[in-house]
């Protein structure tokens, strides 16, 4: 399905004057992943922002629920002149990026042959390539805003596929795989939970740096050619991972910026709405979203 065809589904968004049009983007291996596109108006050409959360799975059901329950961020982006889309992609494969290497596509018997299956960040690549063909989207101004694992996806995407986005925001990026983090038993409150990211105590940046493969992380970051804003959360147990991700970007001479706020909610830049589309948003959440939009405004300005 081409993005200028009729969408697969049209979702009403509580509290919004704009519907969400669900399209299916063909993945690199010939399957399909959904995204729910909203544009500020029916006419015009707009910069576009991918919205992503977590480590995948759930398909259309997850996507439809997310569109309805997390419309505050989309309304803010639409009001600022951005098209945007909640997206869903395949489930993360543990250490798939680290061990899988670059995706190589060959040919056998007149058909494609791959050295591995595409990964979740390559589903985002497929979505970006698909939406770039939409008549309402400015293909030269694509961006990413992702939280948690979807923050790490930005690093993976920008490292493996330079130039796909103009800019990106990684919020509380769970970059343990990208940084090749090797935690020790002492990094967990309960040593029996070793290996579970949710149980790691990685608030201190120097502690994280000592446990990362810094040379490999820098090598991966050397390919990143787009501005990235990293947003942390002051008291998060993984704040050291978030901060080190920024520091290594800056040390690699990348265009990197850092911000962090004190907030009790993981993923606080994506406030949840009730059934009427009303969100209980506090000043900290609005300040963080303001900073994201300001970053996008700066880096997605029309090309001269």
List PLM regions with ranges.
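Alpha/beta-hydrolase active-site loop
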Residues: 102-135
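N-terminal cap/lid segment of alpha/beta-hydrolase-fold proteins
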Residues: 2-43
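Short substrate-entry loop that stabilizes the transition state in hydrolases
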Residues: 44-46, 54-94, 238
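Short beta-strand/loop motif that positions the catalytic acidic residue
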Residues: 224, 230-232
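Primarily recognizes the serine-hydrolase "nucleophile elbow" in alpha/beta-hydrolase
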Residues: 126-186
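Conserved alpha/beta-hydrolase "acid-adjacent" motif
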Residues: 237-243
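C-terminal catalytic histidine-bearing segment of alpha/beta-hydrolase fold enzymes
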Residues: 255-304
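Mobile cap/lid helix-loop segments that gate and shape the active-site cleft of serine hydrolases
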Residues: 166-220
